[in-house]
Every structure is written in structure tokens, then in C-alpha cells.
Amino acid sequence: EGEHGEEEHEDGHGHEEGPTVFSNEATELSVSLDLSSGERIRRVVLNHAMEEISIIGEEAFMAPVDSTETTLGFFSSDDVGFATLDIGLRFDQIERDGFIAEMHHEEDHDDDHDEDHEGDHDEDHEGDHDEDHEGDHDEAMEYDPFSFSDEVFSAAATLRRDLNEHASLSLGLASVSKTPSAVELFMNGEHLASSRYEVGDVNLDTERSDNIDLAFTFDSHNWFGSAAVYYNRVDNYIYLRDELEEEHAAHMDEDHEDEHGEHGDHGGLILSEYTQQDADFTGYEIEVGARFALPRGEFEVTLGRDEVDAEFTDGRAVPRIVPARNMLTARYTLDDFSAKLLVKDVERQTDVAMGETVTEGFTLVNADASWSYGFNDSTRLTLTAFARNLTDEVSRNHTSFVKDQVPLPGRNIGVRVRLAF
């Protein structure tokens, strides 16, 4: 495995291999046992997965990682008289075997060698000498094997009560563990898709999220809707932290003093490191709608909004959080024909983390119209016309690392034909 890691580096170091190839080979075995009896639901699931992730080519920013994950899960659902109680339990055993990549600086010639040849060339050959020894200071990536393993337990329970035949109320409690991914542990290199030099951390701890949510739903005749609020307390929340400008300047000064400035610059990319910190997430989702029976067909309109606030326990904002959104959907159906109009208003995101910039709000207007025809019970033809971003508005996704360089797509109009048989 160590030799394989070196081969990945040698391919990526020269930047001459062509396109990057992301390989993810996985083998998974799952066994499910249903122990239900009558209205009492009992299920047990055992899942075993082996996965190998490798990245080869010019953008080979992570040595191969082998992961083994074994999961034992249990689910039950019972009518406890005044409500329905759902319980889920899960035990995970995770092991990831990868490599820690570190940059190693080498000199091709020692000082004694240089002194012996100091006078061998006259001034006419000084330029040639400099060119011949331009690569005396080489940078090589060294790989040391490392294994991460952990055993974690998660539990969730939901109590759901029907208030009447049209409305219900549910309360959910959960404590969920998430081990660091292969990327979060072993990433080390240029990730051109995000314009960053990303660095993982093999010392990351397992995340634990303690959650509570309350939801209300109703569907009465022509009116329907739902509302939910939630609070998540995440210990050891894992995220990518961008290097600040002043930190970059300080590192560049240090690298200049050490005569290794090229490495400190990271090829002009932003240095972004996986790190973790305790965080709180609070949010809500609300939707209300109405149906109208027309002389021909049915018309439905829905209005919704969602918003989340995420802060670290020291009061700083969590980076790349989705801004508040308002959505209006109108849908018309008649037999095999349907049409939909979606207006999505994304608000300005001003609650930004250190190093982030404010993202302006935008409004997207999308439309679809489709007609289908069934030739028989198993064959159906569907013709769809669609339009995205009808107003051709410039819009940027606040959660994207490259929001300033790559805006969301502009106006897009097209037709799709689908034949299912």
C-alpha cells in the first residue's frame, strides 16, 4: 500500500498525466431480518461495506484509502395508546487505512560538493550553472501509513400523535455519531474544483449531534400545510476552514525566510484545512397550501419558507450556511397534462464567518409543462418542456467555495422526451 501511495504522488507531481480519475470501488453485504408481529414492527439490519477510494492523475490530492464499515441497526414502531412511538438504534464499527502526506525538502548537492566546484566555472558559465542547478531544492511528498478506527452508537426516537383526522404532532429526539470521512482525514493537495489546497487531519474526533425537533402537519379538505422547528447541538463539528489573509501573509514571510516560498504559496490556491469545533444549529421550515377544483383540472398553490442559524459556541458564524429562502409553487393538472411554476426567492446572506463575504440575494423563476401518453400498461411516452432561470438573473450559491468565480446557470430552455417500457 505504501508503494501505491508513492505512485499516486509521482503521477501527480509532474502534472503531465492528463485528466484526474476518481475511483471508488465498494463491496457491500446487507442482511435484513423482519421480526414484526401484527401492528408491532421490528426490524434488524446488519450491513458490512468495504470501500477503496483512490485519485490518480494531475489532481491526485489524496493517497488511496481503504475503509471497512460494519453497521448493526434496529428499528421498532409501536402504538402506545395515545401516540405512535418509533425507535431506531445503530452501532457502527469504522476503520480507515490511509496515508499521512507530508512535504519533504531535499537538496541534490551538499555544501561540500558545492564548495569543491565553486571555482570550476568562470563568469561566462555562471548562467548555465544556475540553470543546471535550478532544481537543487526539490520537494517530495512522503507518505506514512495511518489507521483510524472507532466504534460509535446512535439512537433516535419519535413520538407522533394524531390530534384529529386532519392534523398530527410529532416530537423527535436523537443522538447521532458521525466518524470523520476518508477525505476529512487524509486529504492533502490541490483541489482545483474548489480552488483550494485542502488538508485533512488524522487527529479529528468523531462528531456527535444531539437533536430535538417538533413538527406539525395538517391536511383538511382544500387546505394543507406543515411546520417544523429544530435544534441541533453538534460536538466536534467538522468543517473546512479557509486560511485568513493575515495568516497567509505570515506563513509566506516564514516560508521566505526558510527559502521555501513556493510551497507556502500552494500554487496560488487558498489553504483550507479540515478542523472541528462545537456548534449549534437552529432552524425552521414552514409550508401552507391550497387546492382548487376547476371545471377542467385542479389548481394547487403552495407557499413555503425555511431558515437556519448556525453558530459556533464562541458566537462566530459557521461558514457556508444556506440563507433563508421563500418559495411559491403553482401547479395545474388535467388528466395526462401538468404544468408547474416555481418562484424561489433566496435572501441576502449577511451572517458570514471570518474570511467569508456577503452573498447577495436573488430570485429564480422556473417553469415546467409535461404531457404523457400510455400506449399500454407498461409503455408510456412523456414529453416535457422546461425553462430554468427565466429572468436570466445572475445568482450565486453562498454554500459554494467558488461562488464568486462560478455563478449559478443562466436562462436554460429545453425539451425532454422519455419513453418508459
Model-derived features: where do they sit?
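Surface-exposed extracellular loop regions of Gram-negative outer-membrane beta-barrel proteins
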Residues: M50, Q93-E107, D136-H137, M141, ...
